[in-house]
Amino acid sequence: MHEESSQLSKATGLSPYDSLISKYDIDYDSTKIDEVFSVIEKDIIPKYLEIKKISSPYVYKSNISDPKLLDCVKKKLEQLKFDFNRGRIDQSHHPFCGGATNDVRITTRFEDNILESLSALFHETGHGVYEQNRPIQYLYEPLGQSRSLSVHESQSLFFENHIFKSKVYFKTINNIFGNSKDLEKSFLDHYHTVRINPIRVSADEFSYPIHVYIRYKIEKEIFENQIKFDDIKNLWNKNYLDYLSINLTSDTEGILQDIHWYEGIFGYFPTYALGAMIASQIKYNCPLFGIFLENPDAENISNLIVWLNTNIHQKASLYSSDEMLQTISGEVLNSKYYLDHLVDRFVK
């Protein structure tokens, strides 16, 4: 990877690490990322250490059969403007979204923790709706491509975090389960409570950016030649203890938990947190989001998604990420919106 980053750096004129980041996000380099990620170290980490809980969340187990649940979920996805004439949803061992604009394939799995299954499904649907609404006339040209992984992730996280995990929308989900008090308790435990968890993909929304920040800092040190290979594990463990108050006892729950570095994927991790920040900035500046929160009926949900289609999905690569945010919010990427969202959901 050092050789690849060196050659890319020579070709692009970027620093070795920035040349890797640019494979996944052409708009934000490490200087900008340092700027917006400062909110993680200055604000999110101290608040996390103050409000974190050690206990595990309550898990609700559904007694609805998988086929029946899948049928109910499909109706929800139709409300979210996922076009089943140009896509489909199936069950698999792991959730993902793939295919092309006119043939989007989403998969999910229904497991004991039904909330995690539904959360993953809404996440993948966000990716799918973005893909289905890229401009057809420019589909095979650079202009018609999705802007970046950060923007793509912002849409999946908008569907997952700002729609599915909102308390008002959850009530419409709980209707499927007979307005279960147990499911409501599980929902609040999972998505409105901050907990210690060593695994990134299982972390709550508040602590998740800290997991990303740890990886970003280590990657940056690797490609700036500030750390030796043999010291990476110790730095990882130290950061988990300092930032997350987690004393790691195994590499399975530590440095070996992700597939990215095995596959030679460096510079990817920042896009997860950048996507969350973009999604939050969109949320606070979308004129229809407040209407959705007041009444998440089919019409208001449809209007909200059409707004996303018009202002983000159909713009594809016409604008840079900051230009897109300028048109929506009047300013470039600003991490204060992300902090506001986390405080509103987990602290207030």
In which residue ranges do the predicted regions lie?
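Inter-helical turn/loop segments and adjacent helix faces that build the functional surface
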Residues: 27, 47-59, 135-142, 163-174, ...
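Contiguous, non-catalytic segments that form substrate-binding/exosite surfaces or channel walls
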Residues: 1-115, 319, 331
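Post-HExxH zinc-binding segment in Zn-dependent metallohydrolases
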Residues: 145-183
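Active-site recognition of the HExxH zinc-binding catalytic motif
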Residues: 110-135, 153-157
